[in-house]
Amino acid sequence: MNKLTQGKFITFEGVDGIGKSTQSKMLYEYLKSQKIPVILTREVGGTTVAEKMREILVNEELLPMSELLQAMAARYDHMARKIIPALKDGYIVICDRFIDSTACYQGLELENGIDLVYSLHKTLMPSLMPDITFFIDVEPHTAIKRVNARNMSNKFDIRSIDFYKKIYTCFKELSNRFPERIKTIKASHLSPLEVHELIQKHL
């Protein structure tokens, strides 16, 4: 924890049903308990405008390019209104999903889409990438069982196991592509507390 300084941007990534939101909240509560200035946010969403865009994105069947541009527009609003001001004020920002989710969920649907996602992001906000990203690595079969046990669902929750495998493989490839930023936490057989303790060791 002594390496963690003010104004850092931390993101959590992975397929649905792996405990990202739980881990984001646990880290947020831990940092608060240490009197460290911190905010917790999410994507797609995080601002009033971006949350409205989220409703369309997760519930409507959009054309692949439309879906990507919707996600990027929501992110721009989120970054400009919330993330960047908080970082400038010295807060640690924890975000449940960010650019890597867009690469895997929207980028995979387009030819050369993953590279396009990072190119668009660099154009919109050239100086803003996460300082550290935690990829919560849970096997797709386990993740989809957890999702099916939830009462709420959206269009991403009800996809097939093949879809989950494709997204999982994408996150694995991104962790190899950006090894300095993305830290893989193998969590299939760990309790939430054990995962949280591993995350702390990387800070």
From Swiss-Prot:
Domain of life, per lineage: Bacteria
GO cellular component, one term: cytosol
InterPro entries per record: P-loop_NTPase, Thymidylate_kin-like_dom, Thymidylate_kin_CS, Thymidylate_kinase
Catalysed reaction equations from the record: dTMP + ATP = dTDP + ADP
Family membership: Belongs to the thymidylate kinase family.
PANTHER family (alphabetical): THYMIDYLATE KINASE, UMP-CMP KINASE 2, MITOCHONDRIAL
Protein name: Thymidylate kinase
Pfam hit, one: Thymidylate_kin
GO molecular function terms listed in the Swiss-Prot or TrEMBL record: ATP binding; dTMP kinase activity
Keyword Nucleotide-binding: yes
Record keyword Nucleotide-binding present: yes
Residues holding ATP: G14, V15, D16, G17, I18, G19, K20, S21
GO biological process, one term: dUDP biosynthetic process
Enzyme Commission (EC) number: 2.7.4.9
Keywords for this protein: ATP-binding, Kinase, Nucleotide biosynthesis, Nucleotide-binding, Transferase
Function field: Phosphorylation of dTMP to form dTDP in both de novo and salvage pathways of dTTP synthesis.
